[in-house]
Every structure is written in C-alpha cells, then in structure tokens.
C-alpha cells in the first residue's frame, strides 16, 4: 500500500493538523515507511503462538460474582443532607 500526496492532505485535514505543501512529500515518505513496516509484520508466522496480555504469566484475581449492597450503605449516605432507606432524597425536577 502506498500513500499519495492527496491522502497525506486528507489525513492532515481529518487530524486537524496544519501541513504546508513543502511538508507533504516528507510526510508521504514517513507514512509509506510506517505502512511498509506494518506489511513486514504481516509476514511473521505466528501459528501456535498464544496471545499475550503481559510479559509475565499471571492470573487475574477473581471474586465471587454475587449481588450485595456493599455493606456500607450507612457510610455512603452519611454526608447526604437528606436520605430515606439508604437513598438520597433530592428535589423533584420534572413534573
């Protein structure tokens, strides 16, 4: 894939970057070099390679998926000016 000058201008416009006509050829070369590198990556054989999320193998800490109230409802509403049954009371806004 190759990027032409019109594509460079379009990318600059979409990114809201001011690019002068003198800068277009340089940016065109830079973008083409980046795309060439990405094309090289597609040639790498990754069959049998497990996807990685970290460089060190580790397990996520898991907790039981149970519904609870957090057991701190009194603390949550402690600073509220007005509450009822662990709910915040607010003035009615919509009729």
Swiss-Prot record:
Top-level division of the source organism's lineage: Bacteria
Looking up Gene3D superfamilies in the UniProt record yields: Glu-tRNAGln amidotransferase C subunit, N-terminal domain
InterPro entries per the UniProt record, alphabetical = Asp/Glu-ADT_sf_sub_c (IPR036113), GatC (IPR003837)
Task: Provide the top EC class.
Answer: ligase
Keyword Protein biosynthesis on entry: yes
Task: Give the enzyme's EC designation.
Answer: 6.3.5.-
One Pfam short name: GatC
What are the recorded Gene Ontology BP terms? glutaminyl-tRNAGln biosynthesis via transamidation; regulation of translational fidelity; translation
Q: Which reaction does it catalyse?
A: L-glutamyl-tRNA(Gln) + L-glutamine + ATP + H2O = L-glutaminyl-tRNA(Gln) + L-glutamate + ADP + phosphate + H(+); L-aspartyl-tRNA(Asn) + L-glutamine + ATP + H2O = L-asparaginyl-tRNA(Asn) + L-glutamate + ADP + phosphate + 2 H(+)
Gene Ontology MF terms in the entry? asparaginyl-tRNA synthase (glutamine-hydrolyzing) activity; ATP binding; glutaminyl-tRNA synthase (glutamine-hydrolyzing) activity
* Classification via PANTHER family: GLUTAMYL-TRNA(GLN) AMIDOTRANSFERASE SUBUNIT C, MITOCHONDRIAL
Subunit: Heterotrimer of A, B and C subunits.
Q: According to its UniProt entry, what is the function of this protein?
A: Allows the formation of correctly charged Asn-tRNA(Asn) or Gln-tRNA(Gln) through the transamidation of misacylated Asp-tRNA(Asn) or Glu-tRNA(Gln) in organisms which lack either or both of asparaginyl-tRNA or glutaminyl-tRNA synthetases. The reaction takes place in the presence of glutamine and ATP through an activated phospho-Asp-tRNA(Asn) or phospho-Glu-tRNA(Gln).
Family membership: Belongs to the GatC family.
Any idea what this protein is called?
Answer: Aspartyl/glutamyl-tRNA(Asn/Gln) amidotransferase subunit C
Q: Which organism is it from?
A: Rhodopseudomonas palustris (strain TIE-1)
| Upper classification of the organism | Bacteria, Pseudomonadati, Pseudomonadota, Alphaproteobacteria, Hyphomicrobiales
Q: Which gene encodes it?
A: gatC
């Amino acid at each position: 894939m190759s990027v032409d000058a019109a594509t460079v201008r379009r990318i600059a416009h979409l990114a809201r970057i001011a690019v002068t006509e003198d800068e277009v050829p340089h940016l065109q070369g830079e973008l083409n070099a980046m795309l060439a590198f990405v094309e090289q990556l597609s040639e790498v054989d990754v069959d049998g390679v497990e996807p990685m999320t970290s460089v060190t193998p580790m397990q996520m800490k898991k907790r039981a998926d149970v519904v609870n109230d957090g057991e701190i409802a009194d603390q949550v509403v402690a600073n509220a000016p007005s509450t009822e049954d662990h709910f915040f009371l607010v003035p009615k806004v919509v009729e």
